[in-house]
Design a protein with these regions (language model features):
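Active-site beta-loop-alpha junctions enriched in small/polar residues
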Residues: 17-19, 48-52, 72, 96-98, ...
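Conserved anion-binding
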Residues: 38, 54-55, 64-151
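Conserved, mostly hydrophobic/aromatic
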Residues: 4, 15, 59, 114, ...
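C-terminal helical cap(s) of enzyme catalytic domains, especially alpha/beta-barrels
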Residues: 84, 167, 179-195
Length: 195
């Protein structure tokens, strides 16, 4: 964590997986509490979990700065967006590769971040799905047409080869795991990804 913080990372994107919504299990609230003590980086907390509404307040108390939830697990997205805002936190919505990006359009004016998954959620090291580029373009066009200052974040398969086309399609924030954490020089990797 200190290594990527010193390398100039803007935030830490924390993938929380429950073994239900996605097949993998990662870490949870106790780990967030522990790492909150050692860094001031923003915790961009990506909840790949079923029933996220049950865990909003515990994640806030643990030190999460923002909570991003999957559209696919929210029967009433406006309700969970409101619940996150009541906690005085930023809220993001995620759209998976198979979900039409237009399903997120009704909520764009209510959220602070849109996360486009460019791989299937749940496992690292997957290849970028090129079809995500058109989804990013359509999302960028809609956000711009509405006159919103709403960042588009892209997660999955981000590396020096995919980053330029993702940025070119309209993404603002790139989530890079292996490309940064496995790099011999994380600062150089971050600079390369930023373009």
């Amino acid at each position: 964590i200190h290594r990527v913080e010193e390398a100039g990372a803007d935030l830490l994107h924390l993938d929380i997986m429950d073994g239900h919504f996605v097949p993998n299990i990662s870490f949870g609230i106790p780990i967030i509490e522990s790492i909150r003590e050692i860094t001031r980086l923003k915790f961009d907390t990506h909840l790949m979990i079923s029933n996220p509404e049950k865990y909003l307040e515990p994640f806030k108390k643990a030190g999460a700065d923002s909570l991003t939830v999957h559209l696919e697990v929210c029967p009433d997205p406006a309700r969970i967006i409101d619940a996150i805002h009541v906690l005085k936190m930023e809220c993001g919505l995620v759209v998976n590769p198979a979900t039409p990006v237009e399903e997120i359009f009704p909520y764009l004016q209510l959220i602070q971040l849109v996360l486009v998954m460019s791989v299937e959620p749940g496992f690292g090291g997957q290849s970028f799905q090129p079809g995500s580029l058109e989804k990013i373009r359509r999302l960028r066009a809609r956000i711009d047409a509405l006159g919103l200052d709403l960042p588009i974040q892209v997660d999955g398969g981000i590396n020096p080869d995919t980053a330029p086309s993702v940025r070119g399609a309209g993404a603002d924030l790139l989530v890079a795991g292996s490309a940064v954490f496995r790099a011999p020089d994380p600062a150089a990797a971050i600079r390369t990804l930023r373009g």
